[in-house]
Amino acid sequence: GKPICGETCAKGKCYTPKCTCNWPICYKN
């Protein structure tokens, strides 16, 4: 699978650079 950014995106947005939301977890692009 994709590398996990260690961030959740419960609010629908990832703040870690180059990460995207695949609710509820942020993944690196």
UniProtKB/Swiss-Prot annotation:
* Positions bearing the Cyclopeptide (Gly-Asn) cross-link: 1-29
Instruction: Supply the alphabetized keyword list.
Output: Disulfide bond, Plant defense
Sorted alphabetically, which InterPro entries does this protein's record hold?
Cyclotide, Cyclotide_sf
Q: Which SUPFAM superfamilies match?
A: Cyclotides
Q: Name one Pfam family in it.
A: Cyclotide
Q: Which family does it belong to?
A: Belongs to the cyclotide family.
Q: What is this protein called?
A: Cyclotide mobo-B
Task: Specify the species.
Answer: Melicytus obovatus (Hymenanthera obovata)
